[in-house]
């Protein structure tokens, strides 16, 4: 029998100066080769931006035509080693060899289903990861209060990446609020 390592549960804090999609690609690469990875993003525009950089990804999104959505559903069901990108309903996708779930901006209001019974991606992803021993990674600029509580209780590991922001200072020449040299830069 195959020995499985203990799944990881992580929140990765990215600074605002870092492009979240480029960072997400590096996170996806870290899990590739270890089974399928499900990436859940808040909206269709985020799906399109990510898929533009991951052409081999399978898309699960309500914006697709019915036939394409069903074809992608079957690919998820029977395919192996996939990267699946979708919006909130993708959290329920029956992916054959799912190993990891990555959720971008878990506190976004677009991850919440308002119709009854109300649910959100974060809670479903946590339950699914616990039930199936999956790696669970949340990526964002700031954790929600629910995830912050899980970080505080040590159920989710917190990691932060370093970033450098280049700052230029322009002295005032005539006592103005915004230096005239800066206005020329804009």
Please identify what each model-predicted range represents.
Residues 58-66, 108-118, 171-176:
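Flexible beta-alpha connector loops of hexameric P-loop NTPases
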Residues 20, 24, 43-50, 68-69, ...:
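Helical mechanochemical/support elements of P-loop NTPase systems and associated helical scaffolds
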Residues 49-97:
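Conserved motor-coupling elements within RecA-like helicase/translocase cores
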Residues 5-14, 33-37, 81-82:
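Pre-Walker A (Motif I) flank of P-loop NTPase domains
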Residues 35-43, 60:
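Conserved RecA-like ASCE P-loop NTPase motor core of nucleic-acid helicases/translocases
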Residues 17-18, 43-47, 64-66, 90-92, ...:
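Conserved nucleotide-binding/hydrolysis micro-motifs of P-loop NTPases
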Residues 1-26, 135-186:
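Conserved interdomain linker/interface between the two RecA-like ATPase lobes of SF2 helicase motors
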Residues 79-83, 88-137:
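SF2 helicase catalytic motif II
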């Amino acid at each position: 029998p195959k020995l499985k390592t203990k799944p990881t549960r992580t929140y990765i804090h990215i600074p605002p100066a870092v492009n979240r999609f480029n960072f997400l690609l590096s996170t996806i690469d870290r899990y590739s080769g270890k089974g399928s990875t499900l990436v859940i993003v808040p909206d269709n525009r985020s799906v399109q931006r990510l898929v533009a950089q991951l052409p081999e990804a399978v898309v699960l999104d309500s914006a697709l035509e019915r036939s394409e959505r069903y074809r992608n559903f079957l690919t998820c069901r029977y395919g192996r080693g996939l990267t699946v990108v979708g919006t909130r309903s993708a959290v329920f996708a029956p992916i054959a060899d799912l190993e990891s779930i990555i959720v971008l901006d878990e506190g976004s209001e677009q991850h919440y289903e308002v119709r009854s019974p109300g649910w959100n991606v974060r809670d479903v992803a946590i339950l699914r990861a616990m039930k199936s021993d999956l790696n669970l990674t949340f990526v964002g600029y700031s954790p929600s209060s629910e995830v912050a509580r899980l970080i505080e209780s040590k159920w989710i590991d917190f990691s932060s990446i370093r970033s450098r922001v280049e700052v230029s200072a322009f002295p005032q020449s005539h006592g103005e609020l915004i230096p005239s040299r800066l206005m020329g830069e804009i």
